[in-house]
Amino acid sequence: MAAKGAREKIRLVSSAETGHFYTTDKNKRNMPEKMEIKKFDPVVRKHVIYREAKIK
């Protein structure tokens, strides 16, 4: 049986407080800190910073 993977699913939540989010996964061993990426928010129609949050 294979070992459990190091990748964990995360949610990237918009910093513009619109409620919009992206889902992705990341490798916890290579990147233990919280992820911050600048992506497009279609609600405000601008590029904003998306911060990592746990999937409920």
UniProtKB/Swiss-Prot annotation:
GO terms for molecular function: structural constituent of ribosome. InterPro entries: Ribosomal_bL33, Ribosomal_bL33_CS, Ribosomal_bL33_sf, Ribosomal_zn-bd. GO terms for cellular component: cytosolic large ribosomal subunit. Disulfide bonds: none annotated. The keyword tRNA processing does not apply. PANTHER family: 54S RIBOSOMAL PROTEIN L39, MITOCHONDRIAL, LARGE RIBOSOMAL SUBUNIT PROTEIN BL33M. The keyword Protease does not apply. It comes from Actinobacillus succinogenes (strain ATCC 55618 / DSM 22257 / CCUG 43843 / 130Z). This is Large ribosomal subunit protein bL33. PROSITE patterns: RIBOSOMAL_L33. GO terms for biological process: translation. Belongs to the bacterial ribosomal protein bL33 family. It comes from the Bacteria. Keywords: Ribonucleoprotein, Ribosomal protein.
